[in-house]
Amino acid sequence: MNLPFRKRDYSCLTRLTYKYFVAPERTAEIWQQLEAELGPIRRLDSVRVQQISSAHLIVRATFDGNPITLMQRTPAVDPALLARVHAIFGFTEEPTEEPPP
C-alpha cells in the first residue's frame, strides 16, 4: 500500500473524520508543519494523545504521531485549508473513475 493514504472513520462523532496514514519517517516533520499551520500541539499524558484544535479542525494522534486523525469541526471548512493540510501530509485525493466517452 502506498503512503500516504486515508480511511474514513465512521465511528467518530463528527461526520467528516478521516485517518491519514503517513510514512513513519515523516511523522515528526508533519506534526511540526501542522503546528505552524493550525496552532500549538497539546499533549494529553493521561491518554497518550497529542492534539491540535483550531477553529475548524481537530488533528489528533497517539504519541507516536501516526496515523493522524483529522476531524472537521464545521461542515463548511475552507477548501484551501484542507488543501494546505493535505499538502503537509503529502496526500492527493483518490482518483475518481471517469465514465467512458
Placement of each model-derived feature along the sequence:
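Structured alpha/beta or helical-core interaction and ligand-binding surfaces enriched in interleaved
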Residues: 1-101
